[in-house]
A protein has these predicted regions:
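Short alpha-helical segments used as structural interaction elements across diverse proteins
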Residues: 3, 62, 81-82
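A domain-start/cap signature at the N-terminus of enzymes
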Residues: 81-110
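Bacterial N-terminal signal peptides
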Residues: 9-19
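Alpha/beta-hydrolase superfamily serine-hydrolase fold, recognizing
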Residues: 24-43, 51-77, 102-359
């Protein structure tokens, strides 16, 4: 049965046509039983019903190609929050080990403004970079830490600059705006040591959303802006679901996809806040005056549409914003240190930060 997709904005701004209209076929499906031809129709409400055969692009690395062919178990009962957090902790340990081989560092646990932080100092830190700092807001669906190692270690290594990873309070125990408040508190404290034009704030997934939210909050509070923002795979709003969320899971085409119901996204994080609140959903904010921003996403990212939509909103607000899209790869693929594309993505992120900090 074809997958129901929400309509048509996906055709407007994205160059990767093969990825845009695709049925999610479970990984257990063999080539002999998978769909072999393209079919589609659009009903009177603009809902698309599609089946697509999507070959992997020829320039994908062998490592990335292998990573796409992963067995996904049948959909079982939802995992408990405790189990999810334990799994994320194990994943973080693997990220730490893999990336630390490529980017030697020292890691220290601390607190800043009463907020737990993890400070990653690259072995390549030079005297000229001691007056600069990068502030990371990790991914993890706002309820776990899925990436503070995979986001901070390579960026510290490739920039040669210390990273402060903020271990902000998590939902559902602490819904919005707790994470924003924690990040702003750490930023305020960093301003006592570092000039704002020597700070970059960045994050992936939930941390990318949080980066955009913090930028709006800093403007609202009249605090000085950092030198730059890095928004790597983000939602643009919480009151609606974008097209790519109706196509992909967090593993791209792999796994079971529940059709979006059109309601509030992530109610445990949103809590009692109006989902159109401009800090919570930055697409509704006045974005004028924000610093240069790099957006990064990928062709099979569930948050591809949200990232592209927010990038366009930044451009409409005359922000110096640029967007990089990696073909065919799933959500936050750059956590995987074994992929050449992950190293490339991390270098792109790091080079952008270095250019902005050099101004």
């Amino acid at each position: 049965m074809p997958v129901k997709l929400r309509p048509i904005a996906l055709f407007v701004f994205l160059p990767i046509s093969a990825v845009l209209v695709a049925q999610s076929i479970p990984q257990a499906t063999s080539a002999s039983t998978a769909a072999t031809r393209d079919t589609s129709y659009i009903d009177a409400q603009g809902t698309a019903y599609v089946t697509r055969v999507v070959p992997a692009p020829p320039d994908l690395s062998p490592e990335a190609r292998k990573s796409l062919v992963r067995t996904t178990p049948d959909q079982g009962p939802p995992e408990s929050l405790e189990h999810r957090r334990a799994q994320m902790e194990l994943s973080g340990a693997r990220q730490n080990a893999a990336w630390s081989k490529l980017c030697p560092n020292t890691i220290a646990e601390s607190t800043i403004a009463g907020v737990p932080v993890r400070i990653v100092t690259p072995s390549s830190l030079s005297e000229s970079n001691r007056h600069k700092v990068l502030m990371n807001l990790h991914g993890g669906s706002f309820n776990a830490d899925s990436g503070s190692f995979g986001e901070s270690i390579p960026i510290a290594g490739y920039t040669g600059i210390k990273v402060v990873a903020v271990l902000y309070r998590l939902a559902p125990e602490h819904p919005f705006p707790a994470a924003v408040d924690d990040a702003v508190a750490v930023y305020r404290e960093l301003l006592k040591t570092y000039k704002p034009n020597r700070i970059v704030i960045y994050g992936t997934s939930a941390g990318a959303v949080l980066t955009a939210e913090v930028a709006v909050k800093l403007k609202e509070l009249g605090l000085p802006m950092p030198a730059a923002l890095g928004i790597f795979s983000t939602l643009d709003r919480f009151d609606a679901v974008d097209d790519s969320q109706a196509i992909y899971t967090l593993q791209g085409f792999a796994g079971h996809l529940e059709p979006p119901d059109g309601g509030i996204h992530d109610p445990y994080y949103v809590g009692s806040t109006d989902p159109k609140d401009p800090v919570l959903s930055p697409i509704y904010a006045d974005l004028h005056g924000l610093p240069p921003t790099l957006f990064v996403t990928s062709g099979r990212d569930a948050l591809l549409s949200g990232t592209a939509n927010l990038h366009r909103a930044y451009l409409r607000a005359s922000v110096d914003a640029r967007l990089v899209v990696f073909d065919a790869l799933p959500h936050e693929f750059w956590y995987d240190a074994s992929l050449p594309e992950s190293v490339e993505a991390s270098h792109i992120m790091a080079d952008f930060m270095l250019r902005q900090l050099a101004k």
